[in-house]
Amino acid sequence: MHRLALLLAFVATASSAQSPAEVLVVGNRSSAVSEQIARYYVQRRSVPQRNLCWLEVTPEETIARNVYEEKIAAPIAAFLKAQGLVDRILYIVTTLGVPLRIAGSYWGRDTDAAAVDSELTLLYEIIHGNKPPLRGPSRNPFFMRRDEPFRRPRFPMYLVTRLAGYDFADVKAMIDRSMAAVNRGKFVLDLNSSADRTGNDWLRTAALLLPKDRVVIDETTGVVCGQREVIGYASWGSNDPNRKGRFLGLGWLPGALVTEFVSSNGRTFVRPPDSWNITTWKDTANFFAGSPQSLTADYLHEGATGASGHVYEPYLAFTPRPDYLFPAYLSGRTLAESYYLSIPALSWQNIVVGDPLCRLKKDRGT
């Protein structure tokens, strides 16, 4: 009964259809792949041309705070105002080739380092004259609001996602899969017996809130590999000491979402050598892009349609909650709504990769 009641709470608010006219697409003139992705998405999703905002900024993944303010935030804000889109836009979509993360001067929970996309969620507030604190995470007002549609003026923020992968082919395939997402398949939840109890409890709660016949939950010391017809996957990623391989051989359905409790999985979208593999923090000689940990982009390359990641240390408390993410998505919420319902903080280290409008359609085969 508890499972049904919570699913119905999600379903009751999932019918508020959001449209391509509410999406702002951000491309970078300094990046050929960014231009290619932006144009393809606008065409594929029928986003109005007036909703395409061009930046001229370095395509480097890591930038200084002043570059973000002057070359990204200010031009986007000016564009929204000039086009009369400040309140019309609900979603902002960045692209591969738009800078990924802002370097910081402080570390720990008081850092001013952040993901570019997470900073952009606050642009609505900034345009309206508010000045959020620069250091540390800001509260996400949409977090856990499963009984409310994302709307103005209730939620003064933008839902920001990124169309990124290792190359244009990966991103194009991801966009195409988002258009074919269907409500079928299984949710794979892989616990880590040696990890923090909190994350494991979130995974157990997710299992209770999803249809029992569609859940694969593993509480053993093994690592789930080779599952087919996967529509949702959550685990500890490379933080599970029993995981030795970079790829898990999962068979992804169109629309499949991924989330992991991993500190640096969104650190880069540069493709590692095929010979590279996840390793330990002691094995510094074999780090890739400054870390030994699993990569968000690997899941997208393998066939997932959406994934979360972290550009710097987020701390477990600020990672996406699978017990909110998957029930929301299953109920008919968009990809962007589902992820942001599950993320506690803004102006932080989180990224969401995928088409914000991706939504599970009814499976006509059932």
Language-model segments: which ranges?
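N-terminal signal peptide c-region/cleavage motif recognized by signal peptidases
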Residues: 11-14
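Cysteine-dependent hydrolase recognition
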Residues: 18-366
